[in-house]
Every structure is written in structure tokens, then in C-alpha cells.
Amino acid sequence: MPIKSFKPVTPSRRNMTSLDYSVLTTDRPEKSLIKTRKKHAGRNNQGVITTRHKGGGHKVKYRIIDFKRNKDNIIGKIATIEYDPNRNAFICLVNYVDGEKRYILAPKTIKVGMQIVSAEKTDIKVGNCMKLKNIPEGTVLHNLELRPGKGGQLARSAGSSVQFLGKDEDGKYVTIRLTSGEVRKVLGECRATVGEVGNEDYALVNWGKAGRNRWRGIRPTVRGSAMNPNDHPHGGGEGKAPVGRKAPMTPWGKKALGVKTRNKKKASTKLIVRRRTK
């Protein structure tokens, strides 16, 4: 999908780019599949900030997405391709022959009128969903489960995918390679959808001005060196002062660079064949 640029009529428009939304077929979502989304602004149930730089943003309705793809052996037809304000991937509305409607993530190359199906084993066709143990080697996948029946958790953002590498001798586990370069094992009973997620040019968008990020609910990221010493380890000093420590620090006084952040006690560590590449 092409990237749209703008004439520099204002300073913020000079380098600003946008996605070309001509691929979308409607701007009206299916009413039965939307609900109100409450804002949390990065706070938990006690009001404590757990994720910084979140808050504000335009009011949006949540689209109920079918990540489980558990409607087996019933053919569905792609009715629309739509924008979803809650994610960077597009979504498409699927009309099943039994009358039910569901939203799914829109894979790359999907078109209105195409037919898709979910089953234990089916054709290797973009949009079809099946169990990993029945997928041939080398297949590109998205919306991949980590636990059978829980719903897709991996490769759900725009342009992302995982590659199917092979199966164990006993068939219990399969091996996949993630976009990060990590190679890991997943249960063969888990499901995944064929193809990669669409809207792959999303990463190339230049937002142009701070205000566009505010519309998205993203607040400013303040440099530690611009803070006071009681707010950040880099803060304080006269004028532009250096860090003043051996290494850059996080706001909580831990080393910011080159430190492994994964919990060593995680049970799934034994399933990782090769760590992600930096």
C-alpha cells in the first residue's frame, strides 16, 4: 500500500506522511461487533501508572476481533476491509454461511469476496486457519496461539508474521521463527492463520507533529536530563550536565542499556531454542 505525502503548506506538514486508505471498502463498522472502550491512561486498578506516556486521545469504539478462529468447517466470505482505531493492522468482516458475522485481522493480499475457512486441517490459503501440526514447513503465519484455544497472541501487528520451521519427531511441538529472530517451540495443537498481517507500510509513516500522537493517546516522553534530581538519576546540574554515572539509568535507578529484562524463572524459557537477535 502506498504512502501519501503532503505539500509543505505548514512546517508540520513538510515531512508528514500518511497511509493511503483506498484499500478500505467501508467506514461504517458492524454495529453488533462494536462496544464502548473505557480509557485507562496507563493506570492499573489502583490508579498507579504502570505504562508511562499514555493518556488522552480520540474517543474510539472497540471492535470485537475473533482471535480464536474456532468456527470450524464453516465457509466465510470476506465482506469488507475496515480501519480499526485500536490497532495498526486493518480488519475484515467475515460473513459465514450460517449467518454469523465476525471480524478477523486482515491478512496481506486479502480481497473482498474471497472465501476462508477454519478447520483442524485445510488448504494452505491466505486467511485460512488450522492447527500447527497440520501445516507444512516454510509456511508464513500470523495470529498464532501459545496455548490451545486461548486465541492468537503472536504476530498480530501490521506487517508481522512468523515462519513455520518444522515439527518434532513425536509431533507434540513445532518450531517457529519470530520476526525478532527468536526461534521457539509451540504446541502442535495451537492454531495459526496462513499469511502475514496486512498494512505493512504502517512503520514508514512520519507523524509530522506531536499533535497527531496526542490524537492516538500517546503523551510526551521527557528526557531524564531535563528533570530534577529527585525525579530521575540523570536530572539536576547546571545547564546541560552529563549523566554523572558509569552508565545511563532508568527512572528507577537500574541500568538502561545491555541488561536482560526477561524473568529467569519463566517456565517457557525451556521452549526457546535461540534468543532473539539484537
UniProtKB/Swiss-Prot annotation:
InterPro entries: NA-bd_OB-fold, Rib_uL2_dom2, Ribosomal_uL2, Ribosomal_uL2_bac/org-type, Ribosomal_uL2_C, Ribosomal_uL2_CS, Ribosomal_uL2_dom3, Ribosomal_uL2_RNA-bd_dom. Keywords: Ribonucleoprotein, Ribosomal protein, RNA-binding, rRNA-binding. GO terms for biological process: cytoplasmic translation. It holds the Pfam family Ribosomal_L2. It comes from the Bacteria. GO terms for cellular component: large ribosomal subunit. Residues 223-278 are annotated as: Disordered. GO terms for molecular function: rRNA binding; structural constituent of ribosome; transferase activity. SUPFAM superfamilies: Nucleic acid-binding proteins, Translation proteins SH3-like domain. Belongs to the universal ribosomal protein uL2 family. One of the primary rRNA binding proteins. Required for association of the 30S and 50S subunits to form the 70S ribosome, for tRNA binding and peptide bond formation. It has been suggested to have peptidyltransferase activity; this is somewhat controversial. Makes several contacts with the 16S rRNA in the 70S ribosome. NCBIfam families: rplB_bact. This is Large ribosomal subunit protein uL2.
